[in-house]
Amino acid sequence: MKDRKTKVCFAASSGGHLEELLMMRPLMERYDSFIVTEKTAYETNVDPIKCYYLRQVNRLEIACARKLVMNAFRSLKIFLVERPDLVICTGVLATIPLCLLCKMFGKKLVYIESFAKVKSPTRTGKLLYHFADRFYVQWPEMQECYPNALYVGRIY
């Protein structure tokens, strides 16, 4: 049975972060959900879940700041149209504006640190750790980096 009262935004950059997010498809199907991810040259099938796309951001590019600002405006538009109650994010850079908007609008933010990070935190994780209502790590060792994080196992 689908919970239509709770709207959930699932946000991730492309590649492995999106693959981790898609491992939560049963959760997506349980709620009124939509996905926000980066537009890439390759297509990822997320049907039948609604999907919005942001510009792909690489922190080493000269246009990084410009793309982040553009993504912030795009994220605001998505947020105002969809009005999610909760954002679940697996990172990284392109999704930061959406996560911060979530908190500015008084909504709940859940961040899941990358499966690939076993002993050191991501930059996005270090930032969003201070904003997330729930912060999950996928390795028990990561609780040394994030003392208030929850470890409940791995997505994979």
Predicted ranges, named:
Residues 12-14, 32-68, 141, 152-155:
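Conserved nucleotide-sugar phosphate-binding/catalytic loop shared by glycosyltransferases and other
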Residues 7, 85-86:
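Structural motif
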Residues 107-156:
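Active-site-proximal region of nucleotide-activated glycan assembly enzymes
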Residues 86-105:
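An aromatic- and histidine-rich active-site surface loop
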Residues 62-85:
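An amphipathic, basic-hydrophobic alpha-helix
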Residues 1-42:
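N-terminal subdomain of nucleotide-sugar transferases
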Residues 7, 32-35, 50, 107-108, ...:
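Residues at the starts of beta-strands that form the adenosine-phosphate
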